[in-house]
Amino acid sequence: MNTFSQVWVFSDTPSRLPELMNGAQALANQINTFVLNDADGVQAIQLGANHVWKLNGKPDDRMIEDYAGVMADTIRQHGADGLVLLPNTRRGKLLAAKLGYRLKAAVSNDASTVSVQDGKATVKHMVYGGLAIGEERIATPYAVLTISSGTFDAAQPDASRTGETHTVEWQAPAVAITRTATQARQSNSVDLDKARLVVSVGRGIGSKENIALAEQLCKAIGAELACSRPVAENEKWMEHERYVGISNLMLKPELYLAVGISGQIQHMVGANASQTIFAINKDKNAPIFQYADYGIVGDAVKILPALTAALAR
């Protein structure tokens, strides 16, 4: 048997749902999708869900992952085994851990390949910081997986599809974290998964102010702006949602223009599926040039304005 009888899907990030649904179609005969609102439910059915389960009634001071109890109950009530697919976001991984505990299921994070053999999930993901690929065969009846961005192509919506809609009511967990306050995070809308062209900056750009040079190039060619992990996590120059690498975004754009990025393996596993890689780096021995189809050795601060002017003509 090379498919599960059913798969359960949830995404806290709407842009990740289409790819999870495409993966679900390949892995199971019946697709169940948990959603947070009616609009997401309509989208899920158009993407191929047979059953939509609307999570309802959570108090404002509780976290989404506190739905884990009723989600696990629903999953158990509809089969003695099954596959759960979640995005490898921070919330996705928190929810995966809670579901794994409640379902007595193995949890595998950051999956880059998923297949079914003899009714059991076989998962591949990067190990040793991206230096190797590990393979796991999950033996528990339920399997909970968080999926790396780009593992599956995005499913295409079909308005003619139909499905059944159900409601799952909130039940307060015995122990939970209560949210006492919220602070709005300054963040731009990011949809890098769908970008055809990506300009990505590393610490070689020199300063936060110099990122404006890359932004101008993005505007000139219609690209999205991304970055390496150190730019987001260490320097705090850009949002976490924009960094490319093994523990975050795995992109497949037509063009990936790496600016001031050294090209360490942990970054390149997130960009190496690009159709064309163009690198700008002043270090001629930078590892990025081993991956690049085209490259310029030089100072990005001087090259970017000239490149923008040429491409904007």
From Swiss-Prot:
Task: Give a Pfam family name.
Answer: ETF
For molecular function, the Gene Ontology terms on record are:
electron transfer activity; flavin adenine dinucleotide binding
Q: Does the keyword rRNA-binding apply?
A: no
Gene Ontology process terms (BP): carnitine metabolic process; fatty acid beta-oxidation using acyl-CoA dehydrogenase
Q: Which UniProt keywords apply?
A: Electron transport, FAD, Flavoprotein, Transport
User: What pathway annotation does it carry?
Assistant: Amine and polyamine metabolism; carnitine metabolism
Which residues does FAD bind? 255-283
Record function comment: Required for anaerobic carnitine reduction. May bring reductant to CaiA.
Q: Which family does it belong to?
A: Belongs to the ETF alpha-subunit/FixB family.
Subunit comment for this entry?
Heterodimer of FixA and FixB.
Which PANTHER family does the protein's record reference?
ELECTRON TRANSFER FLAVOPROTEIN ALPHA (PTHR43153), PROTEIN FIXB-RELATED (PTHR43153:SF5)
* Protein name (database record): Protein FixB
Its taxonomic path starts at:
Bacteria, Pseudomonadati, Pseudomonadota, Gammaproteobacteria, Enterobacterales
